[in-house]
Regions:
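A conserved acidic beta->alpha catalytic loop
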Residues: 38-47, 93
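Non-catalytic, C-terminal membrane-associated alpha-helical segments of glycosyltransferases
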Residues: 233-236, 250-337
């Protein structure tokens, strides 16, 4: 089998129904299957999958993963997958008909181990004036991504989104599955599971590329187009980055940066001192942008402060544990066998 598409889901039966309807229109994909992994939903998720499977163009499977978290659900789907290429996405996505074809062509053309594509919005409400049209840190909150019309290698400046990824099967054999201790869980906005996996992939010698023609459309609900949601997301982003720092000594701002001598990084309350300088700079820039009437820049600098608060909170909790002390690859390495 050429492709397996893995969709983790939790209590979003309505969105999942539309996602599966869109996925059913995929063309030129050769042999493929879809695996929906229910992460303890209490709604009609199972019924939606069973009903869709009756007329789906390929095999559509329903699995349950009781361990809470997106990473655990993805691992269950990956272990069950039969495809040589394993694509992962979300339950609130619409697909270009050639999505899988573009993934396969990019993997072959770039001779890489995984690819991530463009993510464009389906707005569920008016786009706010403070949300940049040009990408940047704001876009990560609502899982949008556009690195331009040309392929670029993932690394220091570029990272994919979990909503639009495809892997050669052996990539998981070499670098392991997702870490179930990191990533989204019900009731939180934890993340960084893709970043954590990419660090291990880099250490295993894997390469990933941005594939601009591999496109999905992501539904952005109106309640996520509010400043309070962005503030909450960036706070949890800081918590997540600090958790990643606990496992892998990294640059808090650029996890893939490898030039830092961590023996010379001074910590204050468990947080690298350079982050305090960055926080102070963001505060000054926020005030200046506010006075200048630059709404987008002002809010972007404010979000950097929420990120810092999340880092500070988590590092205070981990203050008696040195960076790297949380690393335990045994619980998530060992992939598809």
């Amino acid at each position: 089998m050429q492709f397996s598409v893995v969709i983790p889901t939790y209590n979003r039966a309505g969105e999942l129904k539309e996602t599966l309807a869109s996925l059913a229109k995929i063309t030129n994909a050769g042999t493929w299957e879809v695996i929906v992994v229910d992460n303890n939903s209490a709604d009609a998720t199972r019924r939606v999958v069973v009903d869709a499977a009756a007329n789906f163009p390929v095999e559509l499977r329903y699995l349950i993963e009781r361990q809470v978290g997106r990473s655990a659900a993805l691992n269950t789907g990956i272990k069950a997958a039969a495809g040589e290429i394993i694509a992962t996405t979300d339950d609130d996505v619409r697909f270009e008909p050639d999505w899988l074809q573009q993934a396969a062509e990019a993997l072959e053309r770039e001779q890489c181990d995984f690819v991530g594509g463009k993510v464009v919005p389906i707005w569920g409400g008016p786009k706010p004036a403070w949300l940049s049209d040009k990408g940047g840190r704001h876009w990560a909150v609502i899982a949008l991504l556009d690195f331009g019309p040309e392929p670029v290698e993932f690394g220091k400046r570029y990272a994919p989104l979990g909503v639009n990824l495809a892997f050669k099967r052996e990539a998981f054999d070499r670098s392991g599955l997702w870490d179930p201790g990191i990533g989204r869980k019900a009731g939180t906005l934890l993340g960084q599971e893709v970043r954590e996996w990419m660090l291990r992939a880099r250490d295993a010698g894997l390469r990933g590329m941005y594939a601009p023609k591999m496109v999905v459309h992501h539904v952005i609900p109106e309640d996520r187009l509010q400043k309070r949601y962005f503030r909450r997301w960036f706070y949890w982003h800081g918590v997540s980055r600090a958790m990643l720092y606990q496992q892998h000594p990294i640059d808090m701002h650029a996890p893939e940066e490898t030039s830092i001598d961590f023996s010379k990084v001074h910590l204050v309350f468990g947080v690298p001192r350079y982050m305090y300088r960055s926080c102070f700079g963001s505060a000054i820039a926020m005030v200046k942008a506010g006075f200048d009437g630059e709404e987008v820049a002002c809010f972007e600098h404010e979000l950097a402060l929420w990120f810092f608060l999340g880092v500070l909170r988590q590092r205070w909790r981990d203050r008696n544990r040195p960076p790297g002390a949380g690393k335990d690859s045994g619980k998530f390495v060992g992939a598809t066998a």
